[in-house]
Amino acid sequence: MRVYISGGITGVENYREKFNKVQEELEKDGHAVFNPALYADALPKLSYEEYMKVGLYFLSMCDAIYMLKGWQKSCGANSEYGYALATDKIILEE
């Protein structure tokens, strides 16, 4: 299954470690994982809106979304969650 990881990035300490740990766990279970924390630094010149468009594009190609603890505090993660609900993605939570 293709899984998109969603959670807070902006203003969150150690977000890379949190995303990467979940990626490793999901991959051990045989899933193909899209980790948006990996492209946060690769696309530094994008606006927030452009960054979200990229994330939603990748989420659109996934079967499921994995919501990290505390995702409710993130505007971006809330948008991704809403998109996942609207498009009938499987929703997994930490």
Regions found by a protein language model. Name each.
Residues M1-E94:
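Conserved catalytic or regulatory cores that recognize and/or transform ribose-phosphate-containing ligands
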